[in-house]
Amino acid sequence: MHELSIAHNIVTIASDAAAEAGVDRISAVHLRIGALAGVVADALRFSFAIAAEGTPLAGAELIIEEVPVVVFCPDCNAEVTLTNPRLFRCPRCDRPCGQIVHGRELELVALETP
C-alpha cells in the first residue's frame, strides 16, 4: 500500500508549510488526484489519518478532488474526457488518443486552518 508513504509525504509537506506560516493546526488538506495516478482515495484517507497522528494535521479532513482522464484528440483538435480511462480512444470519433492532458495529477492544492 503505497498510499501510506504518500500520506506521510503529505503530512510532512503540510507540517512544514504550517510551521513556516506559524500555524499550530491544519483542519483540512485539499488534494487533486488524477484517475491515472494509481492512488486509491479510501486507502489514502485511511493512511492519512494514521500518518497525521501527533502532528499539526491530527484530525484534519482530507478533501480529495478526483480528476478525470482528459486527452487531446488530434482528429477532433480538441481535449476530450475519457469515459473509460482504460481505452485511450476519443469518445467523439473513436480514434486512438495518446496525449494525456489531465489525469496523472497528485497535487496538494490547499491547506485550511481552524
UniProtKB/Swiss-Prot annotation:
Annotated Gene3D superfamilies: 3.30.2320.80
* Protein name per its UniProtKB record: Hydrogenase maturation factor HypA
Q: Which Pfam families match?
A: HypA (PF01155)
User: Record-annotated residues binding Zn(2+)?
Assistant: 73, 76, 90, 93
A molecular function (GO) term: zinc ion binding
Q: Which family does it belong to?
A: Belongs to the HypA/HybF family.
HAMAP family, alphabetized: HypA_HybF
Q: Which domain of life is it from?
A: Bacteria
Q: Does the keyword 4Fe-4S apply?
A: no
Listed binding positions for Ni(2+) are 2
Query: Keyword Metal-binding on this protein?
Result: yes
Q: Which UniProt keywords apply?
A: Metal-binding, Nickel, Zinc
What functional role does this protein have? Involved in the maturation of [NiFe] hydrogenases. Required for nickel insertion into the metal center of the hydrogenase.
